[in-house]
Amino acid sequence: MVYPYRVLCYSKTNILSFSASYQLPEAAIHTFCEQCQKSEYVQVKCVLTSTSLEKMVPLNLLSSDRTMLIGMYIQSLEIRDCGAPAANDIGKIQKIDDYGQFHTLWKAGKNFTVLPGIDSFVIIHNNFG
């Protein structure tokens, strides 16, 4: 089976995304998830997100996972949307909805939702001290 998805792997301190605009073989997804689990990531979850909003699937984040990510600071790399924060802008995750979208308050005071697996960003600081 092939998936036209991006793979998102996250832990307490980082989000790692393996993206492909083409269809991704199931074996490649499993290999990436195995690499995540062997790396420094402690609490790794591998999920699939679609590359198009019409096919976007919920991330199925557990309540504890959402709590873990709320309050983390992210830096935008590339967000493809009108009115999106500029590259390298910094924002704080305020909440995560049922579709796994990160509702973020950006440094300029603007609220903007980030879509993991579609938008590119990195976590630069977390709320664990």
Where are each of the predicted segments found?
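Short amphipathic beta-strand/extended segments with alternating polar/hydrophobic composition
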Residues: F18-L24, S52-L59, T113-I118
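Basic/aromatic-rich interaction segments and small domains that mediate binding to polyanionic partners
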Residues: P4, L59-S63, T67-G129
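Mature extracytoplasmic/luminal segments of secretory-pathway proteins
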Residues: V2, R6-V7, H30-C33, Q43, ...
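Glycine-centered tight beta-turn/hairpin loop motif at sheet-sheet or coil-to-beta transitions
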Residues: T13-I15, S52, K107-G109
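Short, mixed-charge low-complexity intrinsically disordered segments
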Residues: L16, E34-L59
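Short, flexible N-terminal segments of the mature chain
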Residues: S17-Q37, I90-K95
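Short aromatic-glycine-(Arg/Gly/Cys) micro-motifs in beta-strand/loop hairpins
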Residues: M1-F18, Q37
